[in-house]
Amino acid sequence: MKKRILAFLLAVSIAVSVLVLPVSAASINNTALQTAITLGAVPTGQELGANVTRGAFAKMLVSFSTYRESVDAQGTVGTLYRDVPGTSQWAPYIRIAVQQGWMNGYTDGSFRPDNTVTLEEACAAVLKLLSYKTTDLTGSFPQAQLNKAQQIGLRDQLTCTQGQAMTYEQCTLLLYNALRANTASGSAYGSSLGFTVSNGQVDTSSVLLKSRKGPFVAEEGTQLPFTPVSVYRNDKVSASAELNKYDVYYYSESQIGRASCRERV
């Protein structure tokens, strides 16, 4: 009997690990947030109404790119801008974002990482992330970038306007829309990250399963072998990584650091 119960729990855990993200208006904000947390773009518990700084947005861009697994290789040596020392939490992300041409510094040698990012700045950066060049746009900044972003769906469900500072909620939605949008070459951007994109839906399971370990059944005193960046309990974000006896769980030891737990049955 015990073996049969255990097999059932494992089957349940495997089933919930396959995550398909819908794009209906009723669920897209939660879907975008869960995707951002999973990719490490937004820390668990972040106030979604807070404005996003340029430094934080550089991290979000990198997290939604193929460079998200190479951040540690950047190291902490050297100063790219006079206001971004190598020891800054944003330094490796800013270095990647600038090297890839997604963001730029200012002529005075500063990056101004604590300045808030506006709608037009965010759209311009994401368009570059999708390999769009100025020659692909019509007009001048910022209207050309805003129009192109609207045309390819980056601004779907976004209500902010030109000049407005972007919040975490708005940035996660913008970047989630980028996964569904076509790049300059005409292919869905999410596909380049290993996601399956079909009919406006993004399936992240193919990426998450690569680094997933488990499922496991917790015993008395079981602890995760690391501190996870994000935790999901019964498909909902949780602030606690504590495991109870007979909990069924799986986790990823990649840079994402995601842990998911199914309550004991």
Residue ranges: model-predicted function:
Residues 169:
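Surface-exposed binding/hinge segments that line
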Residues 176:
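Conserved redox-cofactor binding core of oxidoreductases
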Residues 2-58, 62-91, 100-120, 126-165, ...:
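Feature responds to low-complexity, polar/acidic, surface-exposed segments characteristic
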Residues 97:
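N-terminal cofactor/phosphate-binding cores enriched in small/glycine residues
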Residues 247-254, 258-264:
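Repeat-associated, polar segments at repeat-unit boundaries in modular proteins
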Residues 235-249:
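Short nucleic-acid-contacting surface segments enriched for D/E, G, S/T with interspersed K/R
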